[in-house]
UniProtKB/Swiss-Prot annotation:
NCBIfam families: PRK03633.1 (NF002962)
Name listed for the protein in its UniProt record: Uncharacterized MFS-type transporter Ent638_1421
Organism annotation: Enterobacter sp. (strain 638)
One GO MF term: transmembrane transporter activity
Homology family: Belongs to the major facilitator superfamily. YcaD (TC 2.A.1.26) family.
Lineage of source species: Bacteria, Pseudomonadati, Pseudomonadota, Gammaproteobacteria, Enterobacterales
Length: 382
């Protein structure tokens, strides 16, 4: 059976449209609020409500998939996200937008859980690395294209909302032409999320997703601030961020293929070591282009490899719950990482960004080295 079957390709097409909409709104919502002269703390609260919605959506989706299946869960998640988009146009204000962004956050997290779980259930331990690499490539390409659309199209609220909402609704169409089946789970009770977090033999994957959240959350949220403090112009910041994200896109396919061929443990060790090297290069004032490229190529590919590691440790009927647990772990890391790193940067030095990332990467590397040889490679799930 081909790795990229018809259902997988249609699912990724829908994801691309959704990611475009998510990227556009995540960039423009803070700007729209700033144009309405809302104080910074309220803009931050609206952003936090979106991530709080992510947490709730992650926890709800497993039971939804068990009851309604992948297709109908995907439709519902897309409609919830579309409602969160439309609501922004009803009234501009702190409480109103905090509510609608919370709803959008729930819908986005549900979409991610459905798509990631469907990909996990569509593959085996021999090709999940490539499936997740394709997923992350689509996600990052959609993010970059979303930023390009912002630079080329009008960005006022009522100009953006109609086509963004239309894009979300259009993302439903591809899955109308296929049916994604959760094979092997029909005769099992829904697995709970919390026991997945405590599985000893999957702990490296869970920890890897937390570390990935810390690394990516810090790079996404604080790298622009670091570059700004170094005297880089706004256009220059956009360029260097594009270099880093593009490196993540380029790295997805080869790293996913290497993980499938040589094992995820070896690839994770190399990735984490390269992240540390990238941080040391930035701290040592090395040439920024190669330093950011290797940091992006290694850091932005941690999540799919760690996820594939954890998912190959559980049975097919546990994949949805495990995926929820991993996305929850990633979200927690992406919330906590930038918060603590920003405090350290403010009180001490901007270099703490790379010291923090290198430190958590080093801790994870020690875990990976300590676990060497403890867990045999499992039999591939059919």
């Amino acid at each position: 059976m081909s790795t990229y079957s018809r259902p997988v390709l249609l699912l990724l097409c829908g994801l691309l449209l959704l990611t475009l909409a998510i990227a556009v709104l995540n960039t423009l919502v803070p700007l729209w609020l700033a144009h309405e002269n809302l104080p910074t703390w309220q803009v931050g609260m609206v952003s936090s409500s979106y991530f709080t919605g992510n947490l709730l959506g992650t926890l709800l989706t497993g039971k939804l998939i068990k009851r309604f299946g992948f297709n109908r869960s995907y439709y519902l998640a897309s409609l919830i996200f579309a409602a969160g988009c439309v609501g922004l146009g009803l009234m501009v204000g702190f409480w109103s937008w905090m509510t609608w962004r919370f709803i959008a956050g729930v819908g986005c997290a549900m979409i991610w859980v459905v798509v990631e779980s469907a990909l996990m259930c569509s593959g085996t331990s021999r090709n999940r690395g490539r499936l997740l690499a394709a997923y992350m490539m689509v996600y990052y390409v959609g993010t970059v294209l979303g930023q390009l659309m912002i630079s080329k199209l009008p960005t006022d609220l009522m100009s953006v909302l109609p086509w963004v909402t239309g894009m979300v609704l259009a993302a439903i169409l591809p899955l109308l032409f296929t049916r994604i089946v959760n094979q092997g789970s029909e005769h099992h009770e829904a697995t709970q999320v919390w026991p997945m977090l405590r599985l000893r033999h999957a702990r490296l994957g869970v920890n890897g997703c937390i570390i990935s959240g810390i690394v990516l959350g810090s790079l996404y949220g604080l790298m622009p601030l670091y570059l700004n403090h170094q005297g880089v112009s706004d256009s220059g910041i956009g360029f260097w961020m594009a270099v880093m994200v593009s490196a993540g896109i380029v790295g997805q396919w080869p790293i996913g293929k290497l993980a499938d061929r040589y094992g995820r443990l070896l690839v994770l060790r190399v990735q984490v070591f390269v992240v540390i090297l990238g941080c040391l290069a930035m701290l040592g004032n090395a040439a920024m282009a190669p330093a950011l490229f290797i940091l992006g190529a290694a850091g932005f590919t941690l999540y799919p490899v760690a996820m594939a590691w954890a998912c190959e440790k559980v049975e097919n009927h546990q994949l949805v719950a495990m995926n929820q647990a991993l996305l929850l772990s990633y979200t927690i890391g992406s919330l906590l990482g930038p918060t603590f790193t920003a405090m350290l940067m403010q009180n001490y030095s901007d270099n703490l960004l790379f010291i923090m990332i290198a430190s958590v990467a080093f801790i994870y590397l020690l875990m990976l080295l300590r676990k060497a040889g403890e867990h045999p490679t499992p039999v591939a799930h059919a």
